[in-house]
Regions:
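Short, solvent-exposed loop/turn segments at secondary-structure boundaries
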Residues: 13-16, 81
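Metal-dependent amide/peptide-bond hydrolase catalytic core
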Residues: 22-199
Length: 199
């Protein structure tokens, strides 16, 4: 979270204020430049500000703005320095515009990186259970996953078993219809993976 601390006042007297809303918009724009100008362009990275709250009336310059967002990357080094990079940008923009700030960064999940050898075992076992035409390798995604903490300590593979119904609402939707009968395929796949890895 980023809290911009400005000086509020009447909209007709902006010269007597430090407009936290304006400072916040500059912060949002500057944060996007971390990805476009400070990270290798062949390395996927995301900085998203998903929440921005400032002001309570059309004719009052707000003294405070609150921004919240998230960062994502597949690179462990980039993941470990997000906080310092973000705060440096916030401090620079706020300093240039005469505002103060409060900065709080929650690190969240590290990148989820599968072990190639274990992933091969999972793929082979899944094919033996559901057939090659039903096993797909999805595109990389920036979604966070707590499995990443396990994969940092032990070689493994994060994989998903489709349990949606044709034409039904997707996962993370209040109308999602979980196909319980497909859990048996997941159990069989897990069992075969365990037997294969245990030799």
């Amino acid at each position: 979270d980023i809290r911009i601390l400005g000086k509020g006042g009447h909209a007709a007297q902006p010269h007597l204020c430090v407009d936290a809303l304006e400072v916040g918009t500059q912060v949002v724009a500057a944060l996007q430049r971390i990805v476009s100008r400070q990270i290798n362009p062949i390395e996927p990275a995301v900085v998203t500000v998903g929440s921005f709250h400032a002001g309570t009336a059309f004719n009052i310059i707000p003294a405070e703005a609150v921004l919240s967002g998230t960062t994502r990357t597949f690179n462990e080094e980039t993941w470990s320095v997000w906080a310092s990079r973000l705060e440096k940008v916030v401090a620079g923009v706020c300093g240039a515009m005469g505002a103060g700030y409060e900065f709080q960064f929650s690190r969240g999940y590290p990148p989820t990186v599968n072990d190639a050898a274990v992933a091969d075992v999972v793929r082979r076992c899944a094919i033996s259970v559901v057939g090659e035409d039903r096993v797909v390798e999805p595109e990389l995604t920036m979604g966070g996953e707590d499995m990443s903490f396990f994969l940092k300590r032990v070689p493994g593979c994060f994989y998903c078993i489709g349990v949606g119904r044709e034409g039904a609402a997707p996962l993370h939707n209040p109308r999602f219809d979980f196909a319980e009968e497909l859990m048996l395929l997941g159990v069989e796949t897990h069992g075969r993976v365990a037997m294969d890895l245990l030799g």
